[in-house]
Amino acid sequence: MAQIKITLTKSPIGRIPAQRKTVVALGLGKLNSSVIKEDNAAIRGMVNAVSHLVTVEDVK
């Protein structure tokens, strides 16, 4: 499967608790931290929920 790189670019401080939990569930902690995840519907849904806080890149 394809993979995506997710980078936390904005702080979740002051966001609603569900968005903060989504950031943690994606494995992101500090600003500019990145994780590589499988590109599937579940991960895409989580990314869409916090799209204003993260950037997404395709990994080859």
Curated annotation (Swiss-Prot):
GO terms for biological process, alphabetical: translation
Cleaved signal peptide residues: none
The entry's keywords: Ribonucleoprotein, Ribosomal protein
GO cellular component: cytosolic large ribosomal subunit
PROSITE patterns linked to this entry: RIBOSOMAL_L30 (PS00634)
GO molecular function: structural constituent of ribosome
Listed InterPro entries: Ribo_uL30_ferredoxin-like_sf (IPR036919), Ribosomal_uL30_bac-type (IPR005996), Ribosomal_uL30_CS (IPR018038), Ribosomal_uL30_ferredoxin-like (IPR016082)
Alphabetical list of SUPFAM superfamilies matching this protein: Ribosomal protein L30p/L7e (SSF55129)
Cross-referenced Pfam families: Ribosomal_L30
PANTHER family xrefs: LARGE RIBOSOMAL SUBUNIT PROTEIN UL30M, MITOCHONDRIAL RIBOSOMAL PROTEIN L30
Family: Belongs to the universal ribosomal protein uL30 family.
Quaternary assembly: Part of the 50S ribosomal subunit.
Name the record gives this protein: Large ribosomal subunit protein uL30
Organism, as annotated: Streptococcus mutans serotype c (strain ATCC 700610 / UA159)
Gene name in the database record: rpmD
